[in-house]
């Protein structure tokens, strides 16, 4: 029964952000763990000299994991300038994009200024000038605005439960299923395995491939209650 309620939260969150499939919802401890998961799993498959683009107004959770991965895998990080009103300099972003750009990860709503970048416009620019994955920090955005990941055209979204009036210690990373399927897990053990041998192991299907250890049943169910509350008061008001 508890497992059923836990899995029901995936479906609730899928509908809340209009994801394609509930299996695309990965539970984490929050945005910080989400960015660490993505940076560790994605960057290991990049080439030396490949580039990551962030902005000058990012939360530390969306900077430090990329810095650590860049140092480990010899990648380069570039930062989009912001103007005096803390808006992203779109012309500067265009100048940074190249064939070496593999990741663009930016904030959806700034916790510093309240700045709301035009995500659809930025995604279109990024995709037209590179083959980069687009990652959105939704910590402040998702609790306050209606978010449709299909409409935005993004590849990954990180969310923290406590920002959504839910419990601490729970969050979500949404990603396109074909991307999750192509990525390696970061943590090992528990139900993330399918079969274990003396010399190797095979992984469970997504989403469980990325959820090692005992699941956060209580926290996830609490997050589901927060999603219900936000849905009932309408995200468009």
Where are these regions (language model features)?
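Pyridoxal 5′-phosphate
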Residues: 1-237
């Amino acid at each position: 029964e508890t497992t059923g309620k836990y899995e029901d939260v995936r479906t609730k969150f899928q509908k809340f952000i209009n994801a394609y499939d509930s299996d695309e919802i990965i539970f984490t401890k929050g945005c910080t763990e989400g960015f660490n998961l993505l940076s560790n799993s994605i960057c290991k498959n990049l080439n030396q000299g490949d580039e990551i683009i962030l902005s000058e107004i990012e939360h530390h959770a969306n900077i430090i994991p990329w810095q650590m991965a860049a140092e480990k895998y010899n990648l380069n990080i570039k930062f989009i300038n912001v103007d005096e009103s803390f808006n992203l300099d779109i012309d500067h972003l265009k100048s940074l994009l190249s064939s070496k750009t593999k990741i663009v990860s930016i904030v959806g709503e700034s916790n510093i200024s309240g700045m709301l970048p035009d995500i659809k416009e930025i995604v279109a620019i990024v995709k037209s000038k590179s083959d980069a994955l687009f990652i959105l920090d939704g910590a402040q955005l998702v609790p306050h605005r209606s978010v449709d990941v299909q409409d935005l055209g993004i590849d990954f979204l990180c969310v923290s439960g406590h920002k959504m009036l839910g419990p601490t210690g729970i969050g979500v990373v949404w990603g396109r299923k074909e991307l999750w399927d192509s990525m390696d897990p970061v943590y090992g053990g528990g139900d993330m395995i399918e079969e274990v041998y003396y010399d190797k192991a095979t992984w469970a299907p997504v989403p469980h491939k990325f959820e090692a250890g005992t699941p956060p049943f209580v926290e996830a169910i609490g997050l589901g209650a927060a999603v219900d509350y936000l849905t009932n008061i309408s995200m468009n008001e």
